[in-house]
C-alpha cells in the first residue's frame, strides 16, 4: 500500500505533553473518587502506550492501536525504558486508583516521553 506509518499516523505526538499536564492537574480532583481515578489512570496509560508507538512508528514502519504490540515495538527501540512502559501497559489494562503510582509514572516515563518526542520531532510538537 501507499500508506507509510509515521507522522501522518501520529495523532497524539503534537498534544501529548498537554495530556500529561492535564492529568497531573486533575489527579487531586479524583482523590475521593476511586472509580474516577481508575478511569483517568486507564485513559492516560493507554495514551502513553499508544504514543510510544507513534514515537517509533516511522522508524519501525508499523502502526497498530493494540496495546501489547505498541509496547513490544517501543521496547525494541528503547530497551532501557521497557520496564516502565510495561508498567504503563499493565495500568492501561488494570488501572489503579493509587494517585502516587499514577503520578510517579507520569513524572518519570511521561515527562521522558514528552522530552523524547520534542527531541525527535520538534516540528510537530505543539507548545502551550
PLM regions: where:
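Conserved nucleotidyltransferase catalytic core and NTase-mimicking acidic/glycine-rich helix/loop elements
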Residues: 5-128
